C-alpha cells in the first residue's frame, strides 16, 4: 500500500483547524465540526496500520527504552480484548480550580466560592458503584484539607487515593523548590484525610512537560511509586507528542510513568483519554479509539475525568466564548457517556491494572551523568 501518512497529516491538521474555526461560530456548527473530525479519524484508521512507537528502536546514542508491560506479551495475547482491565481515574477538584477558572478566580478567593465538589463526587462514586468499578482518585490537597471526610469516604468505598498537588498550579510554571513544597504538603494532607498511603501523582493539566524532568526526581524523593502526568498529544499547554504511549520507568529513576490513553494513526497520537475530549467529541470516536488500543495493541488504557464535568449546573464564572466552551460544553451529556463506557469496558484503579509493573524489580537507575531527558527517548 502506498504511504499516505504525509497526506494524512495534512488532512488531520486541516480538519483540526476547521474544527477550531467552527467552534467560534455556534453550537450547531461546532457539533458538525466535531462529528466531521471524528468521522475523519475513524476513516483514517481503516487505511493506516497502527504503529507502536514504544516498540521502535531508539536513535543512535540514546539508551534503550524500557517499556513496562502489565503482563507478559503472551499473557496479553491470551486475554480477550473484552477482558482487558483499564484504568479509570478522577482528578478530584472543584469547578473553580481549573486552569480556565484561574484567570477569573485567585487562590485567595477559593474559600469564598460556593463549592459543588461533594455532590459531584458522590454522583461519580455512585456511578462507579452501579457498574462495580473502582478508580484512582487524584485528590487536590486544598480539597482534602477542607473536606477530609469526603476523601476518607472515597477511600472507604474501595478507591485508590493519589495526589493532584495542593493549589493546582502548573508544574512548568513552578521552581523545583516550590514544586517540592507544594507536593509534600499535599501528600501529607491527603494521607491524613484518607488514612492511607499515597503513591501516585498527577500534575495539574498534565504539566510535567519537556524542561520539567526534574519533577520526576522530586516525586521519587517524596516516596511516589508512579506518576500519571504525561498525555502524549499536542496541546497548547502540554505538547508531549514525543513521549511514550504506554507505561515506562522514567529514565534515571525507579518511577513508573502511566500515560493517558491515545489512539495512534500513522505518525499521529489522537486524544481519547477522557476529560474535555470525551465531553466535546462524539462518543463513537472515543469508544472506537479505546477499542483499537485494547484489541489491536493488547494494552489497557488510562482514562480521566473531573467531578465538575458532570455538573451542568455549576456557576458560569468564565468570560469569553472559548473559556465557556472548555468548561461547560458537554457537561449535560458527560454522565451518560461515562455510563456507556463503564457498561462496555472493564475498569479498575491504576494500582490494580499495573500491579505487576509496580511490584516488579525496577531497572537499575541510569547514572546521573549519563541521563537523557525522558521526553527525548522517543523519536
Identify the meaning behind each predicted range:
Residues 1-3, 78:
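N-terminal hydrophobic targeting signals that begin at the initiator methionine
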Residues 27-34:
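Short, aromatic-rich membrane-interface segments at the entry and exit
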Residues 40-58:
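Membrane-helix interfacial anchor on the cytosolic side
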Residues 54-71:
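Cytosolic juxtamembrane segments of membrane proteins
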Residues 270-280:
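Surface-exposed cleft-lining segments at the edges of enzyme active sites
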Amino acid at each position: 500500500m502506498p504511504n499516505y501518512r504525509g497526506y494524512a497529516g495534512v488532512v488531520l491538521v486541516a480538519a483540526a483547524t476547521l474544527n477550531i474555526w467552527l467552534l467560534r461560530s455556534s453550537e450547531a456548527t461546532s457539533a458538525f465540526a466535531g462529528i466531521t473530525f471524528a468521522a475523519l479519524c475513524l476513516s483514517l484508521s481503516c487505511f493506516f496500520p497502527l504503529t507502536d512507537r514504544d516498540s521502535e528502536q531508539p536513535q543512535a546514542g540514546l539508551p534503550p527504552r524500557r517499556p513496562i508491560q502489565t503482563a507478559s506479551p503472551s499473557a496479553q495475547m491470551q486475554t480477550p480484548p473484552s477482558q482487558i482491565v483499564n484504568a479509570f481515574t478522577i482528578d478530584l477538584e472543584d469547578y473553580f480550580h481549573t486552569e480556565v477558572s484561574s484567570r477569573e478566580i485567585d487562590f485567595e478567593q477559593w474559600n469564598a466560592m460556593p463549592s459543588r465538589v461533594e455532590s459531584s463526587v458522590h454522583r461519580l462514586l455512585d456511578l462507579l458503584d452501579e457498574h462495580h468499578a473502582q478508580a484512582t482518585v487524584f485528590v487536590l490537597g486544598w480539597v482534602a484539607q477542607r473536606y477530609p471526610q469526603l476523601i476518607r469516604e472515597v477511600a472507604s468505598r474501595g478507591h485508590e487515593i493519589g495526589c493532584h498537588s495542593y493549589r493546582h498550579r502548573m508544574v512548568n510554571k513552578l521552581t523545583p523548590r516550590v514544586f517540592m513544597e507544594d507536593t509534600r504538603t499535599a501528600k501529607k494532607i491527603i494521607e491524613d484525610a484518607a488514612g492511607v498511603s499515597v503513591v501516585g501523582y498527577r500534575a495539574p493539566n498534565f504539566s510535567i512537560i519537556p524542561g520539567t524532568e526534574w519533577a520526576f526526581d522530586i516525586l521519587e524523593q517524596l516516596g511516589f511509586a508512579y506518576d500519571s502526568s504525561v498525555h502524549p498529544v499536542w496541546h497548547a499547554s502540554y505538547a508531549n507528542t514525543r513521549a511514550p504511549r504506554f507505561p515506562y520507568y522514567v529514565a534515571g529513576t525507579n518511577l513508573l510513568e502511566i500515560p493517558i490513553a491515545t489512539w495512534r494513526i500513522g505518525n499521529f497520537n489522537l486524544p481519547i483519554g477522557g476529560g474535555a475530549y470525551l465531553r466535546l467529541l462524539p462518543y463513537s470516536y472515543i469508544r472506537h479509539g479505546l477499542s483499537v488500543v485494547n484489541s489491536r495493541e493488547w494494552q489497557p488504557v488510562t482514562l480521566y475525568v473531573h467531578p465538575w464535568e458532570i455538573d451542568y449546573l455549576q456557576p458560569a464564572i468564565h468570560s469569553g466564548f472559548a473559556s465557556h466552551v472548555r468548561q461547560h460544553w458537554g457537561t449535560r451529556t458527560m454522565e451518560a457517556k461515562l455510563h456507556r463506557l463503564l457498561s462496555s469496558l472493564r475498569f479498575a484503579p491504576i494500582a490494580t491494572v499495573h500491579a505487576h509493573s509496580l511490584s516488579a524489580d525496577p531497572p537499575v537507575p541510569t547514572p546521573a551523568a549519563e541521563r537523557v531527558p525522558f521526553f527525548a527517548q522517543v523519536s
